Curated annotation (Swiss-Prot):
A zinc finger (PHD-type) spans 866-916. Pfam families: Bromo_TP, PHD. Its main location: nucleus. Residues 793-820 have a biased composition (Pro residues). Residues 428-446, 482-494 have a biased composition (Polar residues). Residues 540-578, 599-612, 621-648, 688-699, 712-737 have a biased composition (Basic and acidic residues). Gene3D superfamilies: Histone, subunit A (1.10.20.10), Zinc/RING finger domain, C3HC4 (zinc finger) (3.30.40.10). Residues 128-151, 175-381, 404-507, 519-578, 599-755, 782-820 are annotated as: Disordered. Residues 274-291, 448-462, 674-686 have a biased composition (Low complexity). It comes from Gallus gallus. This is Transcription initiation factor TFIID subunit 3. Residues 525-539, 700-711 have a biased composition (Basic residues).
Amino acid sequence: MCETYSRWLLRVSVAQICQALGWDSVQVSACDLLTDVLQRYLQGLGRGCHRYCELYGRTDPILDDVGDAFKLMGVNLHELEDYIHNIEPVTFAHQIPSFPVSKNNVLQFPQPGSKDAEERKEYIPDYMPPIVSSQEEEEEEQVPTDGGTSAEAMQVPLEEEGDMEEDEAINDENYLSKRPLESPDAEEFPPMKRPKLSVSKGDALDGALEPREPLSSINTQKVPPMLSPVHVQDSTDLAPPSPEPPMLAPIAKSQVPTPKTLESKPPAPKTKSKTSSPGQKTKSPKTTPSPVVAGSPIRSPKTGSKEKKSPGRAKSPKSPKSPKAPVHVPPPPVKPETPSRTPLAALSDKIGKENIQVKQGQTPPEPVTKPNIENQTKKLPVVDKTIDDSIDAVIARACAEREPDPFEFSSGSESEGEIFTSPKRLSVSETTATTPKPSVSTNCSNKAGATPVPPSGGTSSSDISWTMDDSIDEVIRKANMGTPSNPPANFTYFSSPSASPPTPEPLLKVYEEKTKLASSVEVKKKLKKELKTKMKKKEKQKEKDKEKSKEKNKEKEKNKEKDKDKEGNKEAKFQWKELLKDDEHDPYKFKLKDFEDADTKVKLKDGNTKKEKEKHKDKKKEKEKGKKDKDKKDKEKVKDKSKEDKIKPPSAPLVLPPKEMSLPLFSTPTAMRLPSMLPSLSPMLPEKLFEDKEKPKEKKKDKKEKKKKKEREKDKEKEKKDKEKERKEREKKEKEKEKHKHEKIKVEPVVPAPSPVIPRLTLRVGAGQDKIVISKVVPAPEAKPATPVSRPKTPPPVPSPVPAPVHVTPPPAPVPAPPQPTVSPALLPPASPAVSAAGGSKAPVRSVVTETVSTYVIRDEWGNQIWFCPGCNKPDDGSPMIGCDDCDDWYHWPCVGITAAPPEEMQWFCSKCANKKKDKKHKKRKHRAH
């Protein structure tokens, strides 16, 4: 809009200028062109003013800047001044409103004496406005946030903003969740709270990731501590981790069941979408608190109060439901014991022990649950006693009303049963796998029917190192955008309130459906995360492998190759066996297990698989190095056996690629994404193994053959390189010759036996530019006086009909065929003073005359020579030409100012050669004078 408006203003100004200069009218095209010119002119002027402003440290231009800009554009200020004085000023025809309309500054600088100004950190300069103003924070507390994918979309209360740094620290400390936090308050809280926290670490992490979904609950976080139990319950869903960083990690662990409850409570899908990206929680302090709130509803009331105290955490959306809502929420966290009823009993038994004992408040069996409880206890002490009382009341109600919700527990336990069997497995990657399932369960319990976003996104946040947070957020957001619609349809039967425990059959269905839904999205997210982590690990491994390979190269290469072949086969078999075992399970389980067991369990399986992979890589590298070394040794042998080797080569490459293929297929999760890939890969495995077993000897032969081939190729390359070097040397020589203006270089070795016959050899060098004429000469004393070099002039090309050049050439020079011009032996001895001096000795001399064929001579496709006149750079057109007796360049007569052919006896030299002759004469005279 501004551009078109400004262009119309320029158009009016152009018309006014033309009118002021006396024009009555102007063509449209001319007006458009002038408008464009004026626009560019003003833009250039403005750009120059702006640059000079910046150069001198000003924000607004002054008159000096405009003057400098005019000078930069080549405008003489004096002339401009005269022009303005001599022409009447023309005012613009219209009033121009200021555009674009200036907007008020929205930056919320704190007022002096305000809370923000007092709390402002010293290292923050005064000119930096706060990211979020206190007013905005208050509004956020009052108004529920819209669904958004970004972490900032989740509104955070004022307190949270103040504690942003604290939240970040808390997020970082999620890894510290195992560390027990001992606080006197921990024992004060009823065991019911503990059970939620005590839920297996994986559950807590899942809750932390997923709870984000209900953004509406964010408002509840700000609810005053005195809230009624109903409000407390809502806030409990939000239950944010205590402001203390250590507390956050334990809450995340216990929150796995709670996220389900939270998801069930949130009425609006928008909130779910926000919370759905679990990665965001860990990434942004704001998001993290909400997942914590999503934690178990029982402990949530206390956590809610904590959230009130800790601004960073109070993000979990509060459930729109009335106090009854906790009934649905509590079942998953409150009664992990009940899951035993469900067919998932086996899985629940593992998790159930931890969850049930912790919830009962008896003795948490696993150390992980204890630290979680302790962490929560630390968080709880922060809450006011009044809040604690209300929370206790809410908890008591929830305990009375709630029946174990097998769905929620099962959702956590399904994936967790395997993952959480040992506290070690509770590694971040495992928790990520479990989190998606709880989210699905929450979707089922949700009466609102909001489409739950697959929780799989949550897995990413904890799995990857903190540096990967940004990339993880993007991945989670993308996953959340695509997946939310599917789960609700599958879980329609779960819409009924979770107050009454469903029958075990629905649990099985839910479990299968959850695994299916979660598997696709989770697998993708896991794959992305794992790929990132693996890439880093692979780089480190490669560096280690390089160092190892260097050390190993010192050892005997032959023994290494044998051992490597055997070990490589074994490793390949082992890896493929694992893949085949995974294939036996349904594809969804296969994906989950691969990523949870092989990739996500960094502590357990990563050590074995990575070690094997590293060994495999190291072996390959060592093999390659060994091959190179052997190639060097075998080069001599290869020459003899080159014929046999040519026939054998193809076999070796066929055997090796399968080995190389096996590693990437197993190591890279991307290959696993498509289940269709698995069947195609599985048939290949036995064949590869079979080849590896039966053909160890063939492999050795193939390796030798490959080495021989490589040696042959190297020999060929060496020959090519030698040829190229020779060519380069020739080119250099030619350049030097041109620099010396085609001087003759003569080497004169003494020949013991003089021979009256003068055999002559003419050799073509390079692209026909140099002729090496070797002749045996019996020098005669007459040669001394002949200082000028008499050399046959190479005649113009045969096709030229003009006889003139032939007349120009001296009589001794025959007209030879252009491809091989010859030099008459009689002319050679006097070629240079060196030869004449040698002639005085009467010793027979073999002279090698390097005759430079002018660069102005080119051979065409048929081998014919084409002469170019150096004067005009045009080819021989049949007009008369004259050749230089020294450099053999042929010139058109007009180019050198000749109108008639000179006498044949007279030698003709071009300007270059004539100057050389003069220089030589001057040098000789100087030497003689000495």
